[in-house]
Structure formats: C-alpha cells, structure tokens
Amino acid sequence: MPKRKVSSAEGAAKEEPKRRSARLSAKPAPAKVETKPKKAAGKDKSSDKKVQTKGKRGAKGKQAEVANQETKEDLPAENGETKNEESPASDEAEEKEAKSD
C-alpha cells in the first residue's frame, strides 16, 4: 500500500477530515414555499366529489334507519319481553272488578 504524501500547508488549511460525508456537513436546505397551482386545483375537484358521495351515503343511511325503526315496531320486544299494548286494557278490567267487589 502506498504511503500518503503529507504537506504541512495542506493539513493546516483543512480542519475537517476527508472521510466525513458532504451530506452530513452541509446545512439543511430551506423549506419550499411555493406550491403548484395545478395540483391544488386537482385536489379541490376530488374533494368536492368526495363531499358529494358522503352526502349521498348519509341520505341512504338515514333512509335505512327509518326502515329499520318501522320493522322493529312490528317485531316483538327484545329479550323475550312482550309489548305492553294489552296492559292498559287489563288495568281497566282490574279496576272494574275492584269496584264491583
């Protein structure tokens, strides 16, 4: 392996060793301020479409909820409980029986 030539003037002038990466020693680049107007306009169009589809989905969801509520009214109550539609009539019958006694 050949030996390096050492010059005193060259060593004194460079304080940083050569093996250090230029990327590490360089200052970070400033952030870009400009944005491209074409991409911004394209994003606006796509966001408008997304808003419209969300609105349509919301309407369908509300319609589905109303339909579900209507079907739930027709079905018997959950957990094996019965509806209390007949209970007011039975209360009246009990009151009449109590009066007749």
UniProtKB/Swiss-Prot annotation:
The modification Phosphoserine is found at residues 8, 21, 25, 87, 90, 100. Interacts with transcriptional regulator SEHBP. Keywords: Acetylation, ADP-ribosylation, DNA-binding, Nucleus, Phosphoprotein. Residues 1-101 are annotated as: Disordered. The gene is HMGN1. GO terms for biological process: chromatin organization. It is found in: Nucleus. GO terms for molecular function: chromatin binding; nucleosomal DNA binding. The keyword Nucleus applies. The modification ADP-ribosylserine is found at residues 7, 25. It comes from the Eukaryota. Belongs to the HMGN family. Phosphorylation on Ser-21 and Ser-25 weakens binding to nucleosomes and increases the rate of H3 phosphorylation. Binds to the inner side of the nucleosomal DNA thus altering the interaction between the DNA and the histone octamer. May be involved in the process which maintains transcribable genes in a unique chromatin conformation. Inhibits the phosphorylation of nucleosomal histones H3 and H2A by RPS6KA5/MSK1 and RPS6KA3/RSK2. PROSITE patterns: HMG14_17. This is Non-histone chromosomal protein HMG-14. One of its GO terms (cellular component) is nucleus.
